[in-house]
C-alpha cells in the first residue's frame, strides 16, 4: 500500500467543477456520421489510457483496446459487420428490439466503420495468465470493461471528437478478424473521429434526475 494523494477543494469549487463537467457531458452526442478527416494516433492513445484508469475487479484491468486505422482492415471489418447485421435485421431481431431502434433510424449499413479514421474495438479478458504460466479467472470483467468504456467515451468527448457505441450481433467475427486470443471476447466497437459537416443525431431527451435516482437521507 502507498499513501492516497488527495487534495480537498473548497465546496464552491467542488460544485462549480461538478456543474462544468455535467454541462460538458450534456453536450456529448452519439452520431453515425463521421468525417474522414485524420485524427493523430496520440489522441487515441490518450483516450485508451483514460479508459485504463477505470477501477476493475481485483485491479486485473481485464481489457484490451484494439485501435484500427488501416483502411483495408476497416473495410474487412465493415463487410463482416454488415453481413451479420443484415442477418440480424432480416431474421434474428426480436420485435421488442426493433421497436426501440425505430426512432434511431439504424439499419445494416455501417458507413461509420470506414468513414471514421479510427475504429477501436474493446475486448473483455475472461481469464488471465498467472506468473507461473497457469491460467486463472478474472473477476467482474464485464462491469470493469463497462466502466473503462465510459471513461474512454468521456475522454473522446473532452478532446472534441465523437464516437459511437456499436455492437454488431453476434461479434465473434471480431476475434478472428483481429487475431485476438481465445480468452478475449469483443464487447464494443467504437469508431472515433470528427463529425461529418452534415452529421445528424436523433432528437432525443435524457431522463430527469427523479427518473433515474432514489435518495435515502
For each feature predicted by the language model, list its residue ranges.
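N-terminal amphipathic, basic helical "cap/leader" segment at the start of enzyme domains
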Residues: 1-115, 217
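C-terminal helix-cap and adjacent tail motif
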Residues: 2-17, 30-31, 185-217
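Small-aliphatic-rich amphipathic alpha-helix that forms the alpha element of a beta-alpha
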Residues: 47-51, 120, 126-177
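Short, conserved beta-strand edge motifs with alternating hydrophobic and charged residues
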Residues: 66-68, 120-123
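Short, flexible active-site-adjacent loop segments at beta-strand->alpha-helix junctions, enriched
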Residues: 71, 124-126, 196
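Generic beta-strand structural signal
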Residues: 116-118, 159, 186-188
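Short, electropositive alpha-helical surface patch
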Residues: 174-187
Amino acid at each position: 500500500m502507498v499513501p492516497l494523494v488527495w487534495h480537498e477543494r473548497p465546496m464552491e469549487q467542488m460544485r462549480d467543477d461538478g456543474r462544468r463537467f455535467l454541462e460538458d457531458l450534456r453536450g456529448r452526442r452519439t452520431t453515425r456520421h463521421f468525417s474522414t478527416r485524420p485524427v493523430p494516433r496520440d489522441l487515441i492513445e490518450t483516450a485508451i489510457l483514460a479508459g485504463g484508469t477505470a477501477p476493475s475487479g481485483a485491479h486485473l484491468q481485464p481489457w484490451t483496446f484494439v485501435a484500427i486505422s488501416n483502411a483495408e482492415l476497416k473495410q474487412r471489418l465493415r463487410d463482416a459487420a454488415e453481413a451479420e447485421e443484415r442477418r440480424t435485421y432480416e431474421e434474428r431481431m426480436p420485435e421488442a428490439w426493433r421497436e426501440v431502434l425505430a426512432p434511431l433510424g439504424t439499419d445494416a449499413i455501417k458507413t461509420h466503420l470506414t468513414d471514421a479514421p479510427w475504429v477501436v474495438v474493446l475486448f473483455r479478458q475472461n481469464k488471465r495468465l498467472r506468473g507461473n504460466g497457469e491460467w486463472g479467472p478474472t473477476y467482474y470483467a464485464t462491469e470493469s470493461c463497462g466502466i473503462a468504456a465510459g471513461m474512454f467515451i468521456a475522454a473522446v468527448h473532452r478532446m472534441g471528437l465523437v464516437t459511437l457505441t456499436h455492437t454488431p450481433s453476434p461479434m465473434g467475427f471480431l476475434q478472428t478478424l483481429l487475431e485476438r486470443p481465445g480468452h478475449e471476447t469483443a464487447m464494443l466497437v467504437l469508431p472515433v473521429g470528427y463529425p461529418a459537416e452534415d452529421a445528424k443525431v436523433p432528437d432525443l431527451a435524457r431522463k430527469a434526475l427523479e427518473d433515474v435516482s432514489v435518495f435515502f437521507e
